[in-house]
Amino acid sequence: MFIIPTLRNLKQMSIRILFVTVFIFSINAFTAEKEMPSTFKDGDPSKGSSLIASCAACHGADGNSISSDWPKLAGQNQRYLLEQLQYFKSGERVNILMSSVLPILNSYTDQDLLDIAAFYSSQIQTNGQAEDDAELLAVGEALYRSGDMKKAIPACTACHSVNGKGNELAGFPSVAGQQKAYLVSTLKAYRSMERDAGDYALVMQAVSQNLSDYEIEALANYMHGLYE
C-alpha cells in the first residue's frame, strides 16, 4: 500500500531537508576552520590606507560609516571584504550606491583590493546600540540564536557565530554592530533574490525566504546591538 504525501507533509519534509543542508554546510565550514590550514594571504594595511579616499566618503576613514544605509567595514574579515570588492568589480554584485566608485574600483588590481580589505579589517569597529524595545529584541534574539524550525529559518549563529563575528576562513561576515538599515536592506535583497553574488548567496536566499518584514527588523536591531 502506497501513502501519497499531503502538501503539508511535503512542506514539512522540505523544511527538514533545508535544516539538514544548512546544518551540514555549517559543520563543514566549522571543520575546515578547525582542521585545515588557511591558504589566505593577508594584505598590507599600510598600502591599503593610501587607496581608500573614494571609500572613506561613505564608509568613513576608519571604516565606521555615519549613515545607517552604508555598512561599517571596520573589523570585517579580509576574505569577505576582498570577495565583495571583487564581485563589485566584476559586475557580479550590483548596488546603485556603489556605482559612482566603480571606475576607481575597476582600476585597482586584486592586490590593491586585498590591501584595502586588510586596512579596513585592521580598524576597530564602533559598537552599535539596539533599539530598547523588549518585544523586538526578544524576537531578534530568538531568531538569531535558535531560528524558527516551523518557518524553515535556521539559527544565524550557525554561520555568523554566537557573538556575531562570523567565520573568517569560510568568508562568513561579521554582523555584530553592523548598521541596522544596511542589515535590513541586505536581508530584503537576499529575500527577493536581488542579491545573488557568490556561492553563499544561495544559503542566504534560502534562509531569508520566510522572514517577515518585522522579523527582518528584529534581527537587524539585535545584530546592530551585538558586541563583545
Question: PLM features: what roles do these ranges have?
Answer:
Residues S26-N28:
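N-terminal signal peptide c-region/cleavage motif recognized by signal peptidases
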Residues M1-M13:
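N-terminal secretory signal peptides that target proteins for export/translocation
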Residues I66-K72, F88-D132, L169-S174, S192-A218, ...:
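Axial heme c-ligation environment in periplasmic c-type cytochrome domains
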Residues F30-I52, D69, S122-M149:
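Electrostatic cytochrome c docking/interface patches
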Residues S46-A56, Q78, L82, S146-T157, ...:
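Sequence context surrounding c-type heme c attachment/ligation sites in exported
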